[in-house]
């Protein structure tokens, strides 16, 4: 029989530690090689650690909630032969059962009260509950015991209380149940989001400029070619691919926005990695479309859908999230009409797209109804001036209102 250590794997350079969030197996469980043993959470993603071999989980050294480092041993695996396997399993099960019995016996010795009893004790500030004789199972205090005790006290002080009052008391205090609170420990991702957002507010000269765009042209294109697009590429023609293409062309014209500040230097990027804000059950993440300028609209739609699915299932990788020179966030999918998005550091700008609503607009001195959308560009004023930010947003407006300009490169 061999004892095999279960290690935390090497983490990316930007990640220093991780948190144990779930053990899928318990001590004594038989596992096969590559069976997922435990999930760990970094600042960016959830990683799964598989079993290094067939065997039995011998020990769990780092429990749920523990912070662990790369190379740290978090448990051990018992690698055994087939003949000894059944014996070990039986022995392990016996140990587990013994522990369970011991826990049960200890719990039986504890003085425990039901929520109703605890509530009555608290409401009446009863400090001598030990003198009350319990009539419940194993002499546990019941609601009736407390009420009878209160009745006797009040009788002794000539304060009458009848059965109706006692019964009504319980109903009159049920509203207390609606004033409960719940504390939940923040996940590493939520803490990281909090830190980054606070850092953005404190360390950037953030400013937001706005515009609006007539989406009629884009909607007409989707209506006309949407079905053909889906038949050929197997993916729905969404709005994000139009937004990404418009952003890339605008970034080519305004390199200051495709840049970042590093101490007293400005880094200009000659490539276009676009971060896409995606909502997941764990929080907001921004996976990156690498070299988005080289991607077709179908490839963009497929990649964004893949990011969304991986985000829902906590399968995004470190590589998916690293990098990004500019972020697009689409609050319109949740119905947001207007917002001031926060910059995603170390980037210098973020574009907020919003819900499309029909509004009356003036076209050639006539009032017409068109599908309109507000645009919001938040930018770091230390690097980007008003002229560049407004010009950038105007270019996006032009490209979206006449998408053929991108095709013709004009």
UniProtKB/Swiss-Prot annotation:
How is the quaternary structure described?
Answer: Forms a 24-polypeptide structural core with octahedral symmetry. Part of the 2-oxoglutarate dehydrogenase (OGDH) complex composed of E1 (2-oxoglutarate dehydrogenase), E2 (dihydrolipoamide succinyltransferase) and E3 (dihydrolipoamide dehydrogenase); the complex contains multiple copies of the three enzymatic components (E1, E2 and E3).
| Cellular component GO terms, alphabetical | cytosol; oxoglutarate dehydrogenase complex
Cite the Peripheral subunit-binding (PSBD) domain residue spans from the record.
Answer: 112-150
GO biological process: any one?
L-lysine catabolic process to acetyl-CoA via saccharopine
Specify the protein name. Dihydrolipoyllysine-residue succinyltransferase component of 2-oxoglutarate dehydrogenase complex
Query: Which residues of this protein are catalytic?
Result: 381, 385
EC top class, in one word? transferase
- Can you tell me which family this protein belongs to? Belongs to the 2-oxoacid dehydrogenase family.
Q: What organism does the UniProt record list as the source? A: Buchnera aphidicola subsp. Baizongia pistaciae (strain Bp)
